[in-house]
Amino acid sequence: IFVSSTEGAYRERDWQVRFAGQGYNWLGDPGNPAPPPWLEDLQAAGIPAQWSPDILSRLWRKLAINCAINPLTVLHQCRNGGLLGHLDQVQALCVELERLLRQCGQPHAAQDLEQDVQRVLLATATNYASMYQDVRAGRRTEVQYLLGYACQAARRHGLHLPHLEHLLQCLVDNLRVRGLPCD
């Protein structure tokens, strides 16, 4: 079972996570499009959840949105809404991420990506991205799980995505200067 969630939480310190806001959860099994009977138990318990027969598309879309937002907030040292002043960079990344999604067999996830990223920037304008918060707190980031994964997928498919590769290198350099792990 795969899950994509918009629930808000952050790590205060090791082994302590604080719930920061209710979101929504999409669950799915790429091998079985039918929802399991226990899904109703989650909903009855007050956990907002929905079965998504196309969960992989949702997860790829979330990866792309996070790749377009999180690293730039670190490099520009800003809240999500601060990226509205850097839409040229956001747009260039979205063009490349759309190419990647299509090449990875996820055309639905690629549709209107830039508009969705801008919607997220507006809806979360006062929030700090998780990667920004991790850097600020001196914690390990998810750079390799986001940008690293996307760049590896691009190489596997023979795609040259210069903006994405440059962003990864700039972020890794930024983390090294701060003495933070880059792997």
Predicted segments with their positions:
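Helix-loop-beta segment of a Rossmann-like dinucleotide-binding subdomain
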Residues: 14-25, 74-82, 127-136
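Solvent-exposed, flexible loop/coil residues
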Residues: 10, 14, 21, 59, ...
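Rossmann-fold dinucleotide-binding core
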Residues: 1-58
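Short, charge-rich amphipathic segments
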Residues: 20-37, 50, 79-88, 102-107, ...
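NAD(P)-dependent Rossmann-like dehydrogenase/reductase catalytic/cofactor-binding core
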Residues: 91-183
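Long, contiguous hydrophobic alpha-helical segments, chiefly transmembrane helices and signal peptides
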Residues: 5, 25, 64-74, 131, ...
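Active-site-proximal catalytic alpha-helix in oxidoreductases
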Residues: 56-98, 125-126
